[in-house]
Structures are given as structure tokens and as C-alpha cells.
Curated annotation (Swiss-Prot):
The lineage of its organism: Bacteria, Pseudomonadati, Pseudomonadota, Gammaproteobacteria, Lysobacterales. Belongs to the universal ribosomal protein uS3 family. Part of the 30S ribosomal subunit. Forms a tight complex with proteins S10 and S14. This is Small ribosomal subunit protein uS3. GO terms for biological process: translation.
Amino acid sequence: MGHKVHPIGIRLGISADWNSKWYANKAEFARYLAADLKVRQVLRKKMSQAGISKILIERPSNTACVSMHVARPGVVIGKRGEDIEMLRKQVSDIMGVPVHINVIEVRKPELDAQLVAESVAQQLERRIMFRRAMKRSVSNAIRLGALGIKISVAGRLNGAEIARSEWYREGRVPLQTLRADIGYGFSEAYTNYGVTGVKVLMYHGDIFSFSSVSQEKQDDGSRGDRNADRSSRRSREVR
């Protein structure tokens, strides 16, 4: 039997980063985690029309910083910043500390896996054929520079009596390569026939960490020094 692993979790610290960055002792850890989950739930519910890609939460000393990557920042900010100010107060009440909210625009939503998954789910809810929705999203991503993309949908497709899964792929999606920059997105479409799940895997290229490269160079240099010492010892013994 195969064992599936989360495509982001397996790459944490290699080619992916954490969505929450803070330190806590054993007593505070559960409270911080519950607050982060509630903040993400509230933001995605309140700003569902903004096209939220991801929400990053940081906790400096006695404050919090929430960064929202969205496709339509105007929906979050509102007229004269009124909406974002109300949002900041709600998030501050949940977290219990002063909160600063950053709104970061996603320039190319067609290259964001989460936004692509939500787009396909919305098309399915509008009763667009799932194959047409998948092929349209895949072609747009490849046209704008993605090296590979795979979209899979599962559920009662087109109202079929028996649920099944279908997928469509173009380009390369190397899931076994940990240095590969793989974007992952998941969304659900609530149709008259039930819930249809949508998964998107998008390949943007390989990530080569400068720290690992420098470490390899140091290792190679130390190996070279050891080899030079051995050769010098051998030459002395021959003499």
C-alpha cells in the first residue's frame, strides 16, 4: 500500500517555508495554535471574494503581524482603508495582542496553485464541464511560464451516480524531487450532486539553497586538505 505525504510538509525547511513563525512554551503553544487556526478561518470567510492565496502569521514580542497574499487587494482594503481597519480589530481581539496586517498582491494568480484550485472549484459550482475547466486553467498556467501543472478532481463528476477521480497534466511535476519548487492548492466545490474536491500541483523550477551549496564547497575544501595531507605524508615516507 502506498503512503501519501503532504507535498508542503515534506518540503518544509528544504524548498518550502512555514506559514506560522513564532516560539512558545508548552503552556502557550496550544493557545497560539488555536488562535492561528481561528484567524485563518475568519479571514478566509470574511474575504472569500478577495482570492486569498496564503496567510502568514508572525508573533514578535507582544505583537503580531499577519501577511495576506491576495489576488484582489482592493476587496481587503475597502474604501479609504475602512474594511482593513475593522478586520485588524477583529483579528486583534482573537489573538489578544496588537496586530498589523500586510496586504500583498499576487501579480499572476494563474501561477498560484491555491488560486487555480479555487478558480476550478468556482467553475464547477457554475456547472461548467470539469474537463473544460481543468484544461483552461492548465493552458493559462503553461502560457504564463509554469514548467508543469497537474489538476485532479474527485467526486460525482457531471452528476454521475458513482464518484470517481479525473486528472489532467501538462509539463513536468517531479514530486520525488525535494528541491523542486512545487506549489500545492486544494479547494472544494459544493454542487447540487455533492462535494467535489480539487487539487492542484504546480512546478516552477528547482530551488538551490545557497547555504547548502556553500556547505558542500566547505566539505569539498576540507576533503581536499585531507587528501593533500595524506599525499604529503606519503611523499615523506618514500623519501
